[in-house]
A protein has these predicted regions:
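Short helix-coil transition sites and intra-membrane helix breaks within transmembrane domains
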Residues: 16, 27-31, 60-68, 166-167, ...
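Alpha-helical transmembrane segments of multi-pass membrane proteins, especially transporters
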Residues: 36, 44, 56, 60, ...
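Helix-loop-helix hairpins and the membrane-proximal interhelical loops
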Residues: 3-45, 49, 149-191, 195, ...
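Membrane-interfacial helix-loop connectors
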Residues: 72-94, 102-121, 197-234, 243-249, ...
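Hydrophobic alpha-helical transmembrane segments of multi-pass integral membrane proteins
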Residues: 46-72, 186-209
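Conserved small/polar residues in nucleotide/adenosyl-binding loops
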Residues: 303-310
């Protein structure tokens, strides 16, 4: 292994680190800015499931973690402050809200012609401004805003690092061979998505990494579909762990989270497998970052909104 490969590996690892740290920093700043309002909002929910879905989506979009939202829900159910019906609605909304990060990442799809519209163009500036705000402001609210700004900047700078480290090797046979294997085996693709998301404790982060690979034109459509479905299931691990030692109703709330996502994986995985068998050219097509965002949003939203009608 020559020095170029080692350098690219270090750059990719650094990119993942910046992306994850940026996302967590942004989420922490948003949570502190909102204070206890989000928990109060959850506590005041009525039995209106549609309202619960909207609230779950909004809260998850703010804190960038469906797992964290579901953990809060499990805690409320365990304390008797929320019914299972209310919890199910919030969990549905939490899964929909987690797709926001995918759309933010997909903005990196903008090419040089629209460089000034690409958030990555402003990433270093945002990091600098946010750092000055954090260091020199004496007000907590302003410092929280600085954390949000730094987090956004680090998130996009991390994506840039990951993308640039992969770019020189996109023509390497190992990429095409790996995604061909994953694309031809739905269970393998779903399993990879589950494992990566469970390890990172964030479906937003794992989807973001997949989108970065897609930006470099190395991800086939069938592989991306199966991996994304697995990522949705993997996002349930945190809530399942948090439900240990809680009441039966709280455990049911956590189980509903994973059941929704398994149902979605079975539905879209089956439909995808049939379509890819009929149209092999579609399966081999290199998917874009935006297309991953579209599928991620549609699959999650359709599954949960259909469940809400039943």
């Amino acid at each position: 292994m020559n020095i170029e490969y080692i350098s690219s590996l270090f750059e990719f690892a650094g990119g993942i680190g910046m992306f994850l740290y940026g996302m967590n920093t942004m989420a922490d700043g948003m949570q502190r800015s909102a204070g206890g309002k989000m928990k109060k909002l959850l506590g005041y929910l009525t039995s209106n499931r549609l309202l619960a879905i909207i609230v779950g989506a909004v809260i998850t979009a703010i804190i960038q973690s469906s797992g964290a939202t579901t953990v809060m829900v499990v805690g409320f159910v365990n304390a008797g402050l929320m019914t299972l019906v209310q919890a199910v609605g919030v969990i549905m909304g939490a899964n929909i809200g987690t797709t926001i990060t995918a759309w933010i990442v997909s903005l990196g799809q903008l090419g040089d012609a629209a460089k000034v519209m690409n958030p990555s163009f402003y990433a270093p500036f945002l990091i600098g401004i946010g750092a000055f705000v954090i260091l020199f402001s004496k007000k907590d609210k302003v410092k929280n805003a600085g954390e949000i700004i730094v987090g956004i900047g680090l998130l996009f700078e991390g994506l840039t690092f990951m993308s640039s480290s992969i770019a020189p090797y996109t023509d390497a046979p190992i990429f095409s061979q790996a995604f061909q294997i994953v694309g031809s085996n739905p269970f393998l693709g779903i399993l990879i998505g589950i494992i990566v998301t469970a390890v990172l404790q964030s479906s937003s982060a794992s989807v973001g990494i997949l989108q970065t690979l897609a930006l470099n034109g190395v991800v086939t459509t069938n592989a991306a579909i199966y991996i994304t479905l697995g990522q949705n299931i993997g996002s349930c691990v945190t809530a399942l762990i948090s439900s240990a030692g809680t009441t039966r109703t709280a455990k049911r709330a956590a189980c509903m989270h994973i059941l929704f996502n398994i149902a979605g994986a079975l539905l879209f995985g089956t439909v995808g497998f049939i379509l890819f068998s009929i149209y092999p050219a579609l399966a081999a097509h290199n998917i874009t970052s935006v297309e991953i965002s579209v599928f991620h949003t549609f699959s999650v939203s359709y599954t949960h909104l259909r469940a809400n009608e039943t």
